[in-house]
Structure formats: C-alpha cells, structure tokens
C-alpha cells in the first residue's frame, strides 16, 4: 500500500487545522516499545519533512496518553494522561518546540478522552473513569491553573463506569455526546445541565443490548449522530436521528469482523465516514446510503484511531498497535502504472527477486466496492466557478445564470497607497508608512535613503553623500570668495620672495655641464643630465620653463619611477596626471572611497559612459567589502538601476525568512515581501538617472508576480501600468497583458503594420522613438497645414510636436516643449494640463527639440537643437554637431496661425532600435570659453505644467488610471502648439525663475502634492516667434555638469520679452559675462563641457510691464507680499525656465525655499494652542545639541531642518489636520515624561494613519526622539 508518510510510533495522535497539516503523537497507554522502554513523549511531525524518521519537535512526558486533541485555532493541544492528569501544551513554529502550559489533576483516575468544542475554541470536554465528565474553559484555566475548577455537564440518567468517547455537536455549541463501556450513549445539553437523550441498541441477531463505545456527530445536521458497537460478536455502525431516538436510521454491519474502536465523519463531505477496529482494518462508508465504499489493506494489529485531516480531507491517518501511524490518501487507487509495474515485476529474474524482496514494501491497494468522488472534487450540477482579478464568477446550478461577486480576502487588499503615490507623484506617504513597519535594519536603511532622496532630491543628496566628512563646501566657497584678494597677494609674495644677490660660482662638473646646456639653450640635454645625476627637482624646474610637452612627460615619468612605489601620494599624483582612475578604483583602500569618487567626477566630466562605468566598478568593490549602503549611493550616481535591483533581489529570500518568523504563513510572508520590494524599487527608480532596458529576467519575474497579485485585488489599472513598463517583446509579458486586458473588459489594440516597431520597453520612452526624422506620407504634402479643432490622436495634446528628443530618463528635466515627457521608468506619470490659448505660427517641417538640464550632478547639460525639414534626407539627430552646422530647435518665421493635424499612416524614416546608439557626442560643441569662475546663488524651482502622453514613458507607470496604449503613432510631422511642458520632480534641487509681482497666487492645499496650474495667457499678448526662439536658459544647479546654453534669435517687433534671468546656481560654473545689451554668454569652467558652443547674445525689447525679479532670499522672508489675486485681469509676461519653453506659467517656489531658515521668525504666527509643540521641540533640540557627539552632527543638522518644516506647516496651517496635531500634543507630553517608547508609538500612528500629512518633517520628530533617548543619561 502506497503511504504518504509513516511514523514508527505506537501512539495516539491529533491533526492540526492547517491547510498543510501537522500531526502530533503521544505514546499510547498500555504499550511497551521494541526496546522495552516505558518512556513517554509528545512529538510533532511534518508531512513535508525530508526525514520522516525524526520529529520536528519533541517533549518528554512522565505519563502515557490515552487521547490527544488539537484546538481549532491551533493554539492548544490537550492530552489525556494515564496518571489521571489533563495537560495542555503549545507549539512554537519559530523554533520547532512543544511547551507545557498547564496540568490539572481533577480526575480521580485515568483520563480516557478529550475533545475541543467545534464552535468555541476555548471550550474542552474530558472524560474518564467512574463516569467523570468535565467541561473546561481554556481562557480561565490557563490564567490561574492552581485555583481553577472545571464544570460538570449535570445529572445523568444512569450510572456510567467509563467514558471513552466524546463528540461535540457541530452546530450547537452547548450539546455533546458521550459513550463508554456501558450499553448506551448519552446526549448532553449544557444549558439544561443534564443528560437529555439516552441511546441504546439491541442486536436483532442475539437479542442482547450492545456496548456503544464510540460516538460521532454529523458534520452539518444537529439531530443526527453515529455510534459504533465495541462487541466482536456484532460489530455495527448505527446512524441515529434524535427526533426518533428509539430506532437507528441506518445500520452499517456488513464491514468489520470485530469490535469498532474509532469513527470519524468527514467535515467536508457528509457522505464519507471512516471506521477502524480490532479486525486491523480501516473502512470507508457512505453513511447516507449505508454503502461500504472501500476497505483499506489490513494492518498488523488493532487500528485504535483513524481521523481525516480537518483542512485536507483527502488525507487521513490511522494509528495501530503494530508500531506505526500511517498517513494515506483517498486517491490511493489502482491505475495503469500499477498494472505496468506488476507486469515488469513478473518479468524479473529469480535472482533479482530474492535480492530485493527483503527491502520492498507492500504496495497493496485498497479494495473499492463503490467508486465515489468526494464533493470537493466536483460539483454535482453542471455549474462551474473560477476567479481572477478579485472577482469570483459562478455559473448557477441550473446552468442558465452567472453570478459575479467581489469577495474580501485577507492579504488581497488593493494597494491604494502605491496607486495614490503614482497618481499624485508624491511618494512621501508611502515612505512614511514603510518606515514604521520595516523588516530589518538593512531594510530600514534603504527606506531612510529613499526618504532622504524624497526631501533633498537626487542632486542635493549625492552632493552631500559624496562629499568628504569634514567638507563644509558652502562655507569654504564663501570664505574663499571673500578672501580672494588675500590669496592672490599670498602667491605674489611667494613669487617675489627670492632676490638673487652676492657672488657665486659653479662648482663641479655636473653643475657646469648642466649650466652650459642651459645657457646654450639646450634644454633637452639639461634635463637629461639632471635626471642622470638624480637632480629631479632641477629637472622639473627646467621642464616647466620649456614648452616641450614630451620633455615634461619624461620628467614626470622619472618622478613616478622613483617615488611611485614609495609614496601613496605619488600614486594619487600618477592617476591624476595620467587622467586614469583604474589604479585608484582597484587598489585604494575602500574606506577612502570618497577620494576615488571625487577623482572620477573631476576626471570624466563629459565622458558619461566612462564615468558611470568607473562608479559602478567602485560600487561593486564596495559591495564585495561589505559597504552596501555606499555602493547603493554610487549606483545611484551612475544611474545603474540594474545593480541596485541585483542587490535587493539577492536579499529577497532573507527578508522573506524574517517575515516567516513573525508567525506569518509562507504566502503572507512572500506576498508582503514582494509588495515591499516593488514599492522600494518603484520609489528608488524615481530618483535614479539614466536610461536602461529591463533585461533582468529575475526582475521581470518579480514584476509579473506582483502584477498577478495586483490583479487578484481587482486593480487592473495599476497592473496595466506596470505591464507597460516591461519589455513588450517578452512572451510572458504579452500573455499577462492580454489576460489583464480581457479581465478588465478591454481588448488588445490592433497593431497597424505601417507603424509597428520592434523597440523594447525602456525606463524612458518604451513605445516610439521621438527623435527620428519623419518622411512625408505619399499623397499628403508635408507643408500643408490642416486646421485641427478636434480631439487629438491617441490622447496627444493637440498640435504637440512628435519629434522631441527625450530628456534624461530618471531625473525629470526642468522643462520641455515636446509632447512627451520621459522620466524614470518607474517614476510617477505625467498628467494632462490645460492647453494654452496661444497658437504657434510654424511650418509643419519644423521641430521643437529643446533640452532642459538634468538635475543630476553626473548628467551633462543639454543644448537646444535646430529644425530639420521632413523633405530632406533623414539625418541622425544624435550625431555630434559639427562646427557651422545649424543648431536644431529654431522656429520658422513663416507659419500659419492654426496647428496642423498630423498626417495619417506616415512612414517612419528609420526604426527606433537602429538609432539606439546614435547619440554619442550629440551634446558636444567645439567652442571653448573660459571665464573667471564665481559662485552663484541657488534659486528655487517650481514644477511646471504637465503633459499627457499616450504611453508610460518611465519604468514607473505613467498614470494610475491608464489602460493599454493604442498602436504607436506614425512619425508624421505636425505643427507645434504652445502646450505646457512636462513636470519636474518636485524634490529635485534645480534652479527656477522668480515670479514677478504680477504672478497670480497659487493655492496649494497640500505642499507635498504637485501644484495644479490653471493659468491662461490672453491671446495675442506675446509674439509666438519670441516665445519659441527668444528663450534663454538658466544655468543648471548641477555642480558637476556643464550649464545649459542659450538659443538666440531676433524677436519680432512688438513682442513681449521674457523676464530677466536669475543668476546661475552652479557653484562650480563661472559667472556669465554681462553684455551691453543685457544678455550673457553661458558660463564655462573646469566643471563644464569644454566643447560647448555659445551663440550670439539675445536682444530683447524692453518689457512694457512688470518689476524685476525679487531675490530668493527676499522672497523667502516676504512671501506674502508678492502674491497677487489671480482674478485681476492683468496681462502676464511669460516666465522662462532653464529650457526653451515659451509659455511656462509662474509657479510657487518649492517648500524648501519657503521654509524660513530661522524658526524664531515663524513662532509668533503659530496658533496659541499649538505653540507649546514648537516650544518644546526647540528646547529639546537645544538640549541635545551639546550632548550629541560630533560624528552625529549631520543627523542633528538634518533633524533641525525637518523640524523647521513642521514649524512652517504649523504657521501656515496648510497641511496638518486636528487629529495629527492632537497626536503631536500627546507625543510632546510623553517626551516631557521621558516615555520615549510610547512617543514612538504615537509617531508610528501618525505615519500609518496620517501618512499624507507626514511629509518630510515626521522623520525629524523620530530622529529627535531617538537622540533624546540616547542622551537621557
């Protein structure tokens, strides 16, 4: 007989109520094992264990067991001991242990049976000798075992000698049955406190009343019960209907040959009943029809207990006195494989038979009298049901109707937090919630990094993370600027310090030989003789005065040959001199990795590929040496999302195991860990810079698994967005996409053969290449302007250009005039904004290709590109710009007033995948301009308006409400309409323009949500030529990237020029030289692009209205004074951003610029009832500041900055609701009492239940609590 498991124990047992059940066994009373040992043990077994000979947990007990039962909630195991004790046990799955909870000795002698109530987990019944039956309350008896007294069921109708079987009614919690050594069974009612029914049976064969030793209740019918006789003369199973208790309803007496010892009625199918007895057999019955279904092979001794697994009824176990507990399945039936095996066995030789006969087990199958499928294998009617996407679909039993329901299942709730974060592009609530339920310390560090990124932006974060620990760059730069004259005087003093005087003469042949070479002008010989005589310093001075580069190189080589192996500084000098960092990356101590990263930044300012390669190589080395967080920072700087994913994927199993230890099931642990991974990856990819394709199969598999989990909650929109971010040529992605579309009630879009492409989905634009020159469609002239007043094709903004170069993919560009906005692949989506009333007059052959400087310190700035005619030969728009070549991006002066509709079915000039690597050097310009560097003050950036895109352009889905995109658009030309550019990431620290006093007031209810702009400019107030061509760019705030360039063209007369430009915010870029006409050349310097080409300065007409821009410092302190009622009918001049965007409406400054750097200036405006919160937090911060070690000064400074954000919100009354303010009052009160753990509970409550209000200040409160607790003593 094939067995699923076999445990070599002579023991009674009980099943757990799990889907994958465990089995607990206890040495049965009255037996001695093969070693004649009388030891007793309670053991826990797993059906999935690799070694079935060893239990997963064991506990020695001082007495043997008569019975065991496991509570329905799996918390308590009750044991009936032979010494008269009732003992309770608990299991601990974390460390696989069994522990004794309590022991009771209320029975006068041996306890024979125990049974937990089916309806109330805390109620237990026990029976023993002398007719003793006790009712136990687990809640009370475990609290005070020594003082607890169990209840009795009441008065019995007749005396009972021994109670050996108990069974609770499955429908009524107060009714149970008992049976024993007497010739009757009793039905008890605890409410009536007495025996209410007396069952007895007289055999028709012998005329003698039979002993009813076993009792079992019907699983669904409260009036039906089964009893079994223990007599060997007439073994029978009796089915009773208590409404007629005089005569059994059914009698099953054609199976067992001897007395019956055990019954079990299947709880999942009332048509199945198991029995076992002293004839060593187990029988399966249909008690409803009184049919014997199967007889299982006989065992070697009595089978005294058999039970179905409660939650896996296909399995059952049988305990016998043959020293075995066997676990079998109802499906153990004869099949064709058994017949083939029998034929093979008969063909083996006699030698093989006798060699193997002692090792082979019996594979006897059960005898089947009537084949009956359990109800859980199929429906009795032709109905069917299935589930997908959170919906359960059922065909009604009559087959004529359909029922669709949305069941609420624990663990399959919709991820509303992630969906909302993608919609609002505000990940702070998600981060705050994750920070209070981190899995381990490493996971907490990752979320702290994301929280820091969300507050500072990528550029500011990297600037701080890659700076030296003692590098106060801002203070040093200011001090250097103030003392610049003193520095020049210092070097002048050094230069003039030596004054030759007095007589001297040349001594020795060496000096004379070298001097002769010098005075003769033979510099090479002088250097040669100096080096041959080990006069290295003299050789260096001689070479410095020479213009011969080879000579200088030879002297440096001599220096490195002598000192390179002796001095660490020489190694640094060698790498800097050779402009190679391989030696530093491979050999410099990893603890000094910041020296290497600085060298990489400075030596490869323009070679992005080489710089990123070295940063990744350094990150790999840091990761190998245990510097995990530092390696993540370098991968972020290099834009290597794949490297970050590889680290997190390798840690996934460990995080899953840690969740399992928190008493979570395997599924719960896996789904929670998967959701956390996707959320962490999504948030991180929002800040990473670079363009990449998802090729990691393991990462794709995780996303598909999460998509499947998301669809299980019915959130098809979120699932569709993530599917759109995956490679479209992946077969599994295609299958899942089709499945989700059909389940959501949509169909796959028809692919137009004329416009189909083979491009892969990327973290940026995954569907179409917007940079390919477009050929006109035959039969449709490219210069024809077609009035378009209808809805745009495929959701595009009317009149938007389809040929804009994409900006850097992971960090949003400041502005762009292209209709498509690309960010990080998993960045939040772009939202549609209201179209501007301005209409651009432009020829259909023109293209707007304006680039905004990426706000990443390692990304190069971009240059606007010129137009290209669609009728010309297709050009590579990514090829390096040659001197004299026109710059793309200018507007044609001849244009129509109405934007043209894109031609239909135009043929692309080239396929996108052929153009993937054609952009090397497109940003390189030949002209070098060096000017005196100076430090510029940073200004604030407000997010511009948002564009609608037909497809998600980043790794993060484009819109939480989007569905499957239509087929790719044809590369047809279209006129450019003045639409708002895509938004900046609102946390990126990039410069913006200061709004004039006439800017309308923007009302923001949540400072952490993207501001909504509804500003409309009147038609005709601005010349479209000025809007498109006379745009200037603000220098990027990136300290390492070259600043953006300005495109210049002559404005049309009568046009309104843009507002004056603010100063460049690049601390390393030189100051732009002001020209007489008010324009300036772009700054250049050691950290800028050496190949930048500058244009003639623009000439603007004098603005008719509007004051000059206010400095950001004044704006921060006097923000209210520059706000204006938007209802006034004023005409607003256009506001320019750092990229050519003609109609960029003014936006409010970022939160960081609005928060006053002095908290004292805002305290007087805070409401009186909230002032104590501010006062205490200030005082507590002042208290801990001198007590905090110097190495934690950065954390203290960060805490101060975050608390000022909180004070700002309390002053403005714009973010925090009253419940959150009440929580802050409670938190402050607890901190005053030094109850920091309780204060952290309040913090967790805010992060969990008020995450939208937590923003960036909540981490500051948490940090202050931690510092205050650490400095308490």
Curated annotation (Swiss-Prot):
WD repeat ranges per the UniProt record: 6-46, 60-99, 106-146, 158-198, 207-250, 255-295, 298-338, 385-405
Phosphoserine PTM sites in chain numbering: 349, 836, 974, 977, 980, 988, 992, 999, 1053
GO biological process: COPII-coated vesicle budding; COPII-coated vesicle cargo loading; endoplasmic reticulum organization; positive regulation of ER to Golgi vesicle-mediated transport; positive regulation of protein exit from endoplasmic reticulum; protein transport
Cell compartment(s), UniProt: Cytoplasmic vesicle, COPII-coated vesicle membrane; Endoplasmic reticulum membrane
GO CC terms in record: COPII vesicle coat; endoplasmic reticulum; endoplasmic reticulum exit site; endoplasmic reticulum membrane; mating projection tip
Any one GO molecular function term: structural molecule activity
Regions of compositional bias (Polar residues) in chain numbering: 994-1039, 1071-1094, 1118-1129
Domain of life: Eukaryota
Residues spanning the membrane: none
Entry keyword set: Cytoplasmic vesicle, Endoplasmic reticulum, ER-Golgi transport, Membrane, Phosphoprotein, Protein transport, Repeat, Transport, WD repeat
Membrane topology term: Peripheral membrane protein
Positions of region (Disordered): 815-835, 933-1162
One Pfam family from the record: SRA1
Biased composition (Low complexity): 1130-1154
Additional comment: Present with 1840 molecules/cell in log phase SD medium.
Family: Belongs to the WD repeat SEC31 family.
Function, as annotated: Component of the coat protein complex II (COPII) which promotes the formation of transport vesicles from the endoplasmic reticulum (ER). The coat has two main functions, the physical deformation of the endoplasmic reticulum membrane into vesicles and the selection of cargo molecules.
Protein name per Swiss-Prot or TrEMBL: Protein transport protein SEC31
Originating gene: SEC31
């Amino acid at each position: 007989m094939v067995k699923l498991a076999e445990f070599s124990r002579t023991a009674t047992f009980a099943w757990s109520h799990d889907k994958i059940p465990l089995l607990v066994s206890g040495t049965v009373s009255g037996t001695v094992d093969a070693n004649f040992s009388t030891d007793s043990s309670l053991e826990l077994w797993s059906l999935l264990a690799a070694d079935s000979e060893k239990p997963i947990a064991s506990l020695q007990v001082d007495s043997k067991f008569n019975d065991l039962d496991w509570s329905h909630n799996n918390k308590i195991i009750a044991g009936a001991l032979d010494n008269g004790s009732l003992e309770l046990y608990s299991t601990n799955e974390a460390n696989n242990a069994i522990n004794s909870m309590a022991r009771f000795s209320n029975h006068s002698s041996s306890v024979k049976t125990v049974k937990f109530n089916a309806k109330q987990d805390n109620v237990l019944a026990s029976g023993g000798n002398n007719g003793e039956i006790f009712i136990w309350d687990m809640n009370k008896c475990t609290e005070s075992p020594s003082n607890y007294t169990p209840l009795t069921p009441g008065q019995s109708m007749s005396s009972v000698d021994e109670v050996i079987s108990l069974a609770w009614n499955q429908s009524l919690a107060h009714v149970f049955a008992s049976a024993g050594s007497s010739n009757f069974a009793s039905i008890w009612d605890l409410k009536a406190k007495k025996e209410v029914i007396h069952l007895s049976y007289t055999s028709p064969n012998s005329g003698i009343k039979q002993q009813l030793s076993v009792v079992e209740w019907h699983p669904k019918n409260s009036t039906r019960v089964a009893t079994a006789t223990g007599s060997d003369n007439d073994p029978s199973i009796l089915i009773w209907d208590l409404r007629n208790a005089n005569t059994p309803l059914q009698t099953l007496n054609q199976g067992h040959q001897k007395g019956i010892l055990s019954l079990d009625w299947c709880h999942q199918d009332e048509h199945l009943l198991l029995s076992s007895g002293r004839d060593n057999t187990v029988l399966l019955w249909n008690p409803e029809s009184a049919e014997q279904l199967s007889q299982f092979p006989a065992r070697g001794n009595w089978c005294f207990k058999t039970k179905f697994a409660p939650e896996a009824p296909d399995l059952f176990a049988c305990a016998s006195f043959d020293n075995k507990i066997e676990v079998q399945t109802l499906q153990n039936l004869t099949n064709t494989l058994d017949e083939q095996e029998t034929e093979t066995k008969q063909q083996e030789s006699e030698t093989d038979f006798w060699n193997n006969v002692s090792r082979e087990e019996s594979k006897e199958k059960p005898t089947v009298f009537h084949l009956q499928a359990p109800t859980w294998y199929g429906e009795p009617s032709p109905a069917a049901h299935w589930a997908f996407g959170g919906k359960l679909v059922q065909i009604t039993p009559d087959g004529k109707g359909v029922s669709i329901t949305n069941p609420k299942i624990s663990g399959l709730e919709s991820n509303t937090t992630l969906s909302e974060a993608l919609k609002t592009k505000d990940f702070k609530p998600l981060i705050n919630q994750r920070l209070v339920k981190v899995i381990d310390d490493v996971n907490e560090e990752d979320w702290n990094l994301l929280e820091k990124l969300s507050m500072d932006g990528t550029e500011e974060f990297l600037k701080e993370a890659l700076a030296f620990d003692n590098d106060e760059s801002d203070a040093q730069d200011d001090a250097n600027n103030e003392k610049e004259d003193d520095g020049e005087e210092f070097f002048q003093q050094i230069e003039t310090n030596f004054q030759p005087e007095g007589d001297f003469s040349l001594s020795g042949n060496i000096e004379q030989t070298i001097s002769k070479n010098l005075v003769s002008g033979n510099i090479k010989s002088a250097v040669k003789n100096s080096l041959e005589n080990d006069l290295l310093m003299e050789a260096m001075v001689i070479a410095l005065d020479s213009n011969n580069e080879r000579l200088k190189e030879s002297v440096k080589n001599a220096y490195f040959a002598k000192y390179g192996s002796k001095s660490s500084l020489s190694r640094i000098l060698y790498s800097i001199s050779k402009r190679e960092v391989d030696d530093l990356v491979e050999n410099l101590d990893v603890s000094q990795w910041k020296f290497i990263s600085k060298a990489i930044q400075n030596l490869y300012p323009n070679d992005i590929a080489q710089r990123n390669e070295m940063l990744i190589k350094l990150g790999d080395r840091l990761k190998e040496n245990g510097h995990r967080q530092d390696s993540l920072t370098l991968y972020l700087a290099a834009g290597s999302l794949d490297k970050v994913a590889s680290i997190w994927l390798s840690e996934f199993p460990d995080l899953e195991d840690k969740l399992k230890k928190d008493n979570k099931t395997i599924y719960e642990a896996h789904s929670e860990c998967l959701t956390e991974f996707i959320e962490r990856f999504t948030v991180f990819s929002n800040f990473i810079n670079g363009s990449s394709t998802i090729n990691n199969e393991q990462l794709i598999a995780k996303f598909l698994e999460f998509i499947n989990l998301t669809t299980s909650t019915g959130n098809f929109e979120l699932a569709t967005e993530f599917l759109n971010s995956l490679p479209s040529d992946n077969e599994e992605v295609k299958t899942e996409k089709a499945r989700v579309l059909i389940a959501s009630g949509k169909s796959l879009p028809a692919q137009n053969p004329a416009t189909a492409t083979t491009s892969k989905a990327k973290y940026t634009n995954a569907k179409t290449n917007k940079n390919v020159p477009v050929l006109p469609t035959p039969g449709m002239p490219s210069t024809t302007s077609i009035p378009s007043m209808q809805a745009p094709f495929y959701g595009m903004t009317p009149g938007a250009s389809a040929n804009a170069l994409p900006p850097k993919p992971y960090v949003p560009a400041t502005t762009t005039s292209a209709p498509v906005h690309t960010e990080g692949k998993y960045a939040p989506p772009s939202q549609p904004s209201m179209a501007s009333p301005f209409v651009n007059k432009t020829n259909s052959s023109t293209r707007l290709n304006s680039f905004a400087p990426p706000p990443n310190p390692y990304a190069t700035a971009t240059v606007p590109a010129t137009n290209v005619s669609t009728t010309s030969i297709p050009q590579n728009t990514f090829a390096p710009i040659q001197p004299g070549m026109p710059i793309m991006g200018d507007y044609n002066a001849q244009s129509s007033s109405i934007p043209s509709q894109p031609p239909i079915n135009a043929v692309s000039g080239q396929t996108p995948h052929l153009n993937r690597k054609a952009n090397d050097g497109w940003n390189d310009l030949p002209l070098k301009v060096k000017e005196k560097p100076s430090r510029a003050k940073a200004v604030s950036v407000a997010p511009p308006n948002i564009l609608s895109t037909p497809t998600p352009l980043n790794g993060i889905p484009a819109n939480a409400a989007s569905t499957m995109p239509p087929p790719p658009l044809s590369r047809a030309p279209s006129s450019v309409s003045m639409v708002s550019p895509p938004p900046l990431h609102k946390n990126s620290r990039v410069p913006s323009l200061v709004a004039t006093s006439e800017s309308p007031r923007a009302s923001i209810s949540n400072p952490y949500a993207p501001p909504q702009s509804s500003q409309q400019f009147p038609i005709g107030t601005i010349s479209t030529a000025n809007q498109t061509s006379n745009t200037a760019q603000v220098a990027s705030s990136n300290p390492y990237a070259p600043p953006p360039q300005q495109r210049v063209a002559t404005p049309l007369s009568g046009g309104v020029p843009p507002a004056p430009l603010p100063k460049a915010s690049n601390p390393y870029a030189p100051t732009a030289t002001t020209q007489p006409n008010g324009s300036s050349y772009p700054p250049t310097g050691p950290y800028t692009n050496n190949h930048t080409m500058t244009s003639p300065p623009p000439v603007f007409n004098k603005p008719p209205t509007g004051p000059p821009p206010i400095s950001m410092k004044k704006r921060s302190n006097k923000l209210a004074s520059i706000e204006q009622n938007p209802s006034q009918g004023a005409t607003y001049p256009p506001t320019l951003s750092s990229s050519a965007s003609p109609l960029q409406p003014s936006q409010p400054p970022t939160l960081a610029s609005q928060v006053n750097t002095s908290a004292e200036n805002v305290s007087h405006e805070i409401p009186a009832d909230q002032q104590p919160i501010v006062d205490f937090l200030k005082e507590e911060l002042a208290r801990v500041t001198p007590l905090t070690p110097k190495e934690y000064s950065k954390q203290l400074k960060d805490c101060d900055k975050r608390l000022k954000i909180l004070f700002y919100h309390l002053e403005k009354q714009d973010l925090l609701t009253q419940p959150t303010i009440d929580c802050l009052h409670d938190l402050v009160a607890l901190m005053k009492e030094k109850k920091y753990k309780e204060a952290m509970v309040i913090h967790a409550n805010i992060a969990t239940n008020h995450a939208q209000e937590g923003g960036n200040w909540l981490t500051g409160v948490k940090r202050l609590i931690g510092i205050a607790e650490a400095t308490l003593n």
